[in-house]
């Protein structure tokens, strides 16, 4: 059966993360049968990492705050998590299903495909987002 996405529900969750006034900084999009629907959401990145278990595949939209003391800004990441115990067929299907998620999640600084929990570390993601942002204007120390 072809995968579908609940666009309205997923768009509402996506917009919640994009809203700077919202405490929600991440949302997952998971499979409910053959439909992609919003999953968990939260205000703590560590709670997101707990969703990424070896037997699950999911997509996540995450807001990170970057910059220095003078200039804070939000950067967004689209993360595809594929656990180690996910079957080969499901792994392959995740890649094509991501196009459905991208119909909703359109604005992000960098995309990640991760199956190793070490790559989910917040510092690693932030450093990759910083590289993707181009020039580094952090306050210089002399």
Curated annotation (Swiss-Prot):
SUPFAM superfamilies: Actin depolymerizing proteins. Keywords: Acetylation, Actin-binding, Chaperone, Cytoplasm, Cytoskeleton, Nucleus. This is Coactosin-like protein. It comes from Homo sapiens. It is found in: Cytoplasm; Cytoplasm, Cytoskeleton; Nucleus. Residues 66-75 are annotated as: Flexible and important for F-actin binding. The modification N-acetylalanine is found at residue 2. The lineage of its organism: Eukaryota, Metazoa, Chordata, Craniata, Vertebrata. PROSITE patterns: ADF_H. It comes from the Eukaryota.
